[in-house]
Structures are given as C-alpha cells and as structure tokens.
Design a protein with these regions (language model features):
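A conserved donor-nucleotide-binding helix/loop in the catalytic core
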Residues: 84-110, 114-120, 126, 197, ...
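Conserved donor-nucleotide/metal-binding helix-loop-beta segment in metal-dependent transferases, i.e.
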Residues: 115-177, 181, 188
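A short acidic (Asp/Glu
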Residues: 62-65, 117-122, 127-129, 154-156, ...
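Conserved beta-strand elements of beta-rich interaction domains across eukaryotes
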Residues: 18-21, 57, 85, 114-115, ...
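N-terminal anchoring/stem segment of glycosyltransferases
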Residues: 14-106, 207, 249
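Short, high-confidence coil segments that cap the C-terminus of an alpha-helix
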Residues: 9-11, 104, 139-141
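Catalytic core and acceptor-binding pocket of nucleotide-sugar-dependent glycosyltransferases
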Residues: 1-26, 178-277
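A generic structural motif
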Residues: 42, 76-85, 143-148, 227-235, ...
Length: 277
C-alpha cells in the first residue's frame, strides 16, 4: 500500500499524529493497509544498516508492530519499554540510553500507536533500501517528520509554562525562536505547509543521533525530568527536541516535503493525490 502526494512524492512511512485519528484520509489509509495483502521485503532493516526502534507498553500490540508483522519482520522492531505512570520524558531518556547499544550505521525511530510502514513503490520488496536512499538524499545527519500543526505552541497550546516562570520560562522563549525559525526556513524559503517539527518519526546516523540526544538531555531535559509526568508541561518529549533543532541546523532538519514521512494531522484531500494497493 502506497500513497502519492500532490507534489508527486511517494513517502514511505505514514504517521497519524495527534488529531489525525479523526481525519477521513487517515482512516482510509488505515483501512487500505489493514485490508491489503501481507508482503515480504527482500531484506531486513539490519541488512541495510538500520536499527528500528519504538516505545510502548510491553503488554500491548501496537499499529507499528502489526505493520512489521505484515512484513514478516516482527522481530526486527526493537520495542523500548515504557511503563505506567508515564513520564513522557522517558522517551528521550531511554532513547539516549539505548543509542549507546546500537551498532548499525543508521537509526530509525517511529511512534508505536499510529505509524504504518508502506509496502513501497508498486509493491516492490525494496522498502529498507529505499528508506536508506531517501534519507541519504536529505544530505543531513538527522531528519524528523514534519507536520502542519504547531504543538506545543508559544500561545499556550500544549504547554502550561509561562514566560515569567524562571528557568522554565527560557523553554518558552526558545519555543518562540523555534516557531520563527520554522516559519522562515520551511514555510517561507521552502514554501511548505508542513513546516512544523514532529518528534514521532526520525532517521539519522547513529553516532550523530547519540550526540543530539545527549545534548537535549543534558541541556534541557535532565533539570526538569520529574515534570515529565505532565504531558502538558512542554508537549511531552516534542517540545524539548523541537527547540534543539535550530542550534543543530542544517545537520538536523525536518522532512518538509514529505519525501520519507507523511503526517496526517490537518491534511486535506488536496494534499493527497491517491492511495493505492
């Protein structure tokens, strides 16, 4: 199953982020995927030098796990366990820790509950080869998926931080700078509607991704880690990763043209040219 965008792109990974769950285009995509035939790629992610990770409660079977099972590759997905009560910042902490164990050249991180891996162009079995090829064409070291929604936003949506909140207020000031950066680079310069950072899908060179996550942890997350039980503190993990992108640009970028990742929150029929078996 594949989708084609209005820019004649064929993204490989689909993310029904946030409010996309009620989007009719996402619902149609999920239905097509569920009803579609199983397929077997010609190689594993590891054979292409890719480790694929996700984060979920061990007892649950998620959409991403089912996607891998349809490929006959359930064991190729590394599930980093997240336990209740949720500390949303564990996603950063545990990713940072697990990155130290990875020996492959590339790391692909995908949210568990709302991500589907496509069956590739015309059902050809080269999905992992193509994922790697698309990533390398970004000419960056780490790419995140991009979305239309601004979350968390400096006007208070998704965060309860106020600008006068001492050290925490610095996070909000950084967020305002990041919003302006995203608008300048991805909206105005790149002429994209998908100009906001989303943390639910990323791919990078493992060594550089280690550096990025260590910096985010040490500089932004560790001092406020205990506040992570409240997703509304700073948008879960997303706010922290998002504000770090500017200082790492252009090594860190977002997929504003949806070449690798397609997010679905806020999309409309004009964004998608077709959904195909």
């Amino acid at each position: 199953m594949r989708i084609e965008t209005n820019k004649a792109k064929w993204p490989l990974i689909y993310h029904g982020n946030g409010p996309a769950k009620e989007n009719e285009i996402w619902k149609k995509t999920v239905k097509q995927w569920k009803n579609g035939a199983d397929f077997k790629p010609n190689c594993t992610p590891e054979e292409e030098g890719i480790t694929v990770i996700t984060w979920s409660i061990p007892e649950e079977t998620t959409m991403l796990q089912k996607s891998f099972e349809k490929m006959g590759m359930g064991k190729e997905l590394i599930v980093i366990p997240i336990t209740k009560p949720f500390n949303w910042l564990d996603k950063i902490k545990k990713t940072k820790e697990y990155l130290e164990l990875i020996e492959t050249k590339y790391i692909l991180g995908l949210d568990a509950t709302d991500v589907i891996v496509s069956s590739d162009i015309e059902g050809k079995p080269t999905i992992w080869y193509d994922v790697k090829g698309v990533f390398k064409n970004f000419n960056c070291k780490l790419v995140y998926n991009a979305e239309k929604m601004n979350w968390p936003s400096s006007d208070g949506h998704g965060t309860n931080i106020k600008e006068m909140d001492g050290l925490n207020g610095n996070l909000l000031r950084k967020l305002k700078e990041t919003e302006e950066f995203e608008e300048r680079i991805y909206k105005n310069l790149m002429d994209s509607d998908f100009y906001r950072f989303n943390s639910g899908g990323f791919m990078g060179y493992t060594d550089f991704t280690k550096e990025f996550y260590n910096t985010v942890w040490n500089k932004y997350v560790e001092p406020v880690y205990e506040k992570g039980f409240d997703e509304g503190f700073f948008g879960g993990d997303q706010g922290f990763l998002r504000i770090a992108q500017k200082e790492f640009f252009p090594d860190v970028t977002i997929d504003c043209n949806c070449k690798l990742f397609q997010t679905f929150a806020g999309i409309n029929p004009d964004d998608i040219r077709g959904i195909y078996e």
